[in-house]
Amino acid sequence: MARFGAVIHRVFLPLLLLLVVLGACHVTPAAAAAGARLSALAKALVVEASPRAGQVLHAGEDAITVTWSLNATAAAAAAGADAGYKAVKVTLCYAPASQVGRGWRKAHDDLSKDKACQFKIAQQPYDGAGKFEYTVARDVPTASYYVRAYALDASGARVAYGETAPSASFAVAGITGVTASIEVAAGVLSAFSVAALAVFLVLENKKKNK
């Protein structure tokens, strides 16, 4: 029995300690995301979007031209400061006015809890500056929006950001679910129903007269 206890002590105890150490050192992606805060990121990107403040765009139809570049006046623009930037991810974010009373759209400093920037516009390799056109997706709901871009490192973690002014937001008119084609189809069916009813009444009237 004593010998068995010694084996347990020599083999399993070190293994248990190793597992504990590995568990303590391991950081899950969720935990890493929870540690990312917007207030801790350098505002190192300049982001511009083509819509004017207050302009209304239509989901599934209108396009936005987005440009981004390294902020030349920021401390992050020092030589080589952006060496760790590997990609830029651009998102469409609910403006403050469209967050009021809607917890599912609420902005949060802890980016793992942020619900304002739900719509991914694009992601492209970091090259100091970029420009692209985005057609507003059909599933973007009616609301006011602004654009935010994140600089990502090699692991995909957000390390810097930039955004258009939330106060100069533009609007998107979402698709209500009743499209023009549906309205046309409904009109055709309605006309067909009236015509069919008229034919039926005429035939019934002829039968009675016989």
Curated annotation (Swiss-Prot):
The chain crosses the membrane at residues 182-202. The lineage of its organism: Eukaryota, Viridiplantae, Streptophyta, Embryophyta, Tracheophyta. GO terms for molecular function: nitrate transmembrane transporter activity. The keyword Cell division does not apply. Involved in nitrate transport. Keywords: Cell membrane, Membrane, Nitrate assimilation, Signal, Transmembrane, Transmembrane helix. This is Probable high-affinity nitrate transporter-activating protein 2.2. Induction: Not induced by nitrate in roots. It is a single-pass membrane protein. It is found in: Cell membrane. One of its GO terms (cellular component) is plasma membrane. Pfam families: NAR2. Belongs to the NAR2 family. Residues 1-23 form the signal peptide. GO terms for biological process: nitrate assimilation; response to nitrate. InterPro entries: Transptr_NO3_Nar2.
